[in-house]
Amino acid sequence: MISNLRISNYFIIFYVLFLIIPIKVTSIHFVDSQHNVILILTDDQDIELGSMDFMPKTSQIMKERGTEFTSGYVTTPICCPSRSTILTGLYVHNHHVHTNNQNCTGVEWRKVHEKKSIGVYLQEAGYRTAYLGKYLNEYDGSYIPPGWDEWHAIVKNSKFYNYTMNSNGEREKFGSEYEKDYFTDLVTNRSLKFIDKHIKIRAWQPFALIISYPAPHGPEDPAPQFAHMFENEISHRTGSWNFAPNPDKQWLLQRTGKMNDVHISFTDLLHRRRLQTLQSVDEGIERLFNLLRELNQLWNTYAIYTSDHGYHLGQFGLLKGKNMPYEFDIRVPFFMRGPGIPRNVTFNEIVTNVDIAPTMLHIAGVPKPARMNGRSLLELVALKKKKKKHMTALKPWRDTILIERGKMPKLKKIRDRYIKQKKKFNKENRLSKECKRRKWQRDCVHGQLWKCYYTVEDRWRIYKCRDNWSDQCSCRKKREISNYDDDDIDEFLTYADRENFSEGHEWYQGEFEDSGEVGEELDGHRSKRGILSKCSCSRNVSHPIKLLEQKMSKKHYLKYKKKPQNGSLKPKDCSLPQMNCFTHTASHWKTPPLWPEELGEFCFCQNCNNNTYWCLRTKNETHNFLYCEFVTEFISFYDFNTDPDQLINAVYSLDIGVLEQLSEQLRNLRKCKNRQCEIWSTSQMLRSPKLVDLRVNEKSFLTYQPEKT
């Protein structure tokens, strides 16, 4: 009996060991399979304006030897909120860093979210972690965030010279000497030093490194050896460049006019400087991968390259900046390479900054925390491989993401907002309102381009004063008779809107120091505005200041502009309530290429407090659109299949049922938590047969169509 009991006990022990040993072996195998992981993050780098075309080394290393995600997006086009998303894997409404000020390294961030960053998770998984470069905009350098073994972060925002860093707990100050102070090179040098030292001393331990470059963020100081490059480069002039004003878009763009020659010169020079700063990043990437090759670590290292958001330079008349829910601000470079990642391949599926944290943890063999909202990119790679082999066991990839900026209050029902907006922007209503103005009811006097008249059907119609139009207008085209009246109404309303904005001083760009006298000069010509611009092509009507330039030679205009004026808009006056404005002067840039003094200075308002929105960005085999709701109750919809530059707000062409479904999906994504966000990131409704075609024909509500070529 005792013998049988012993045998039974031995059997139990053997059975328990049998259960335990595979677990331990699996665990060891999991740790042994951990790879090094590097995240390379740039600051304000676009993809829409062509910046990657000027980084050949990075393109070869990351694109040709890795995978490009052509639909790489950020879920918010603002620095600190986007970076907080990258570090946590959370949407903005879950980490509550809504702006570059509010909670950017604030109390909630430090007490809650910073303690659950990818650095903490990777460190706990046995990685040696390092962070170098820009952290968050309001980081004051007084502490080292949890999770980082090696820490070299700039205090506050990006700079290239004259900055302070927290280097492993010690504050370091840097000057203006290129060889030892240039921040981009310093980030590269210290990153290489970290890798080299780590591999030589701790080769058995995987490392995780975030390299956060300042380029091409302002003040856009290029390294001296690159300051001569890219003269006359204008790749930033996309289809939406200087397409303004836009009465069918949100409040700010309704009040942003076309750029004049000085503004255009500014965007050209700023684009050039941005590309120049990226050359140091390009060299740094090459040096980084050369070192990994020398240390025999390429086979064992994953790398991700992306930016915190995009940028605009003249798009829709906006001189510079981010913050907008358009492709140029939300779409970013997005590349990945490493073991098992296909080479020289492009994926079109939507990926975002919310996916970076889950991806880095997946590489480390760490299960994704339930709180994270994104998904590992390795799952997408596996899914593509499975599809290629006709295996569909994995969950399908998303086709929709949330784009958000700021806190959204409770709004009225979408149907009520839509009807109100549709009524406001209806052509007939707008035509009636405009034609009631006395100046359009008078007979065709010299210089007048349009006349309104009332028909027997009690409707306003417009009459073109043909004797006052130039026969030399190259922009005028022969049109079909059936479309003649409707096209004339389009042209008239566009012209009237632009004139109304200019007469009302509502243009939020280009206020020069001598704006007082420019305004007086314009006042003398307002009654004759038609004389100044008889050839009124809707896409070529200029900013009001441009009208003065048309009457003055360039030499005289520059001389006139430099002369001090009474009542001028001084730099300290460059502000408007609820607006974010800046003054550009010749002293703004300290390094070549410099702003020509003869072009003077100007004020520009690039953002406003009511530019708060939540959007759906959807892209799949049948649909490709952006749907947005603004805090002002404004609604917009852009169909990329027919309008890739987002020139037309086509919301009035949507069926009300589709609109309500889009609004419902947006509402659910706005409040999603944890893994719910992935559930609401699939547009199931768009697969309904009756909703395959999102649009219906309501031509009278398509307010501003671009000229057909």
Curated annotation (Swiss-Prot):
Binds 1 Ca(2+) ion per subunit. It is found in: Endoplasmic reticulum; Golgi apparatus, Golgi stack; Cell surface. It is an enzyme of class 3 (hydrolase). Its EC number is 3.1.6.-. The modification 3-oxoalanine (Cys) is found at residue 79. InterPro entries: Alkaline_phosphatase_core_sf, Sulfatase_CS, Sulfatase_N. Residues 1-27 form the signal peptide. The keyword Hydrolase applies. GO terms for cellular component: cell surface; endoplasmic reticulum; Golgi stack. Keywords: Calcium, Endoplasmic reticulum, Glycoprotein, Golgi apparatus, Hydrolase, Metal-binding, Signal. It comes from the Eukaryota. GO terms for biological process: heparan sulfate proteoglycan biosynthetic process. The keyword Transcription regulation does not apply. This is Putative extracellular sulfatase Sulf-1 homolog. It comes from Caenorhabditis elegans.
